Amino acid sequence: EPTRLTAKPSIANLVLWKAIYEYDGHYYVDAVRVGTQRRWYPGARVAKLDLGRDFPGLQPDSVQARDVERFRWFSDGYLTVEEHAPRIGDLRYSFLPNEVDPMWGIELSLNDQDEHVAWWASRRTDGRIRRQFVRMVLGLDGVSLDADQATPP
């Protein structure tokens, strides 16, 4: 059973929602289109941020550790770490609601732990992302959730 579940509208509309649930140290992300032509868009799974595992050199009393805790509070704890960079992202917001690709976050510098973390924001919206987003908003693709059209995934 999930530890917690959150659903929120995706960017700039009320038809396509992002669903995030936490289970066993991971976040699972899916998109759901509501209203007519209800659809489910399976998403991704990502490990929940664990500072001890993901940043073992981070000193708990450092400025950066306090910055991470502040960011955790503002993001309601929905944090994940990028695989090949010292970045922590806010999982709640992404351009495609069924993907784990945060729009913003913070970047740590373990060599300068008494300096504040850096803020980053991604503005990547290539043609593929825009087309996929529009298709999802229009109810194309995905798995039907309407009883008369539902088929097992």
Tell what function each PLM region has:
Residues 1-3:
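Alpha-helical transmembrane signal-anchor/signal-peptide segments
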Residues 14-153:
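Extracytosolic and intramembrane catalytic regions of membrane-associated proteins
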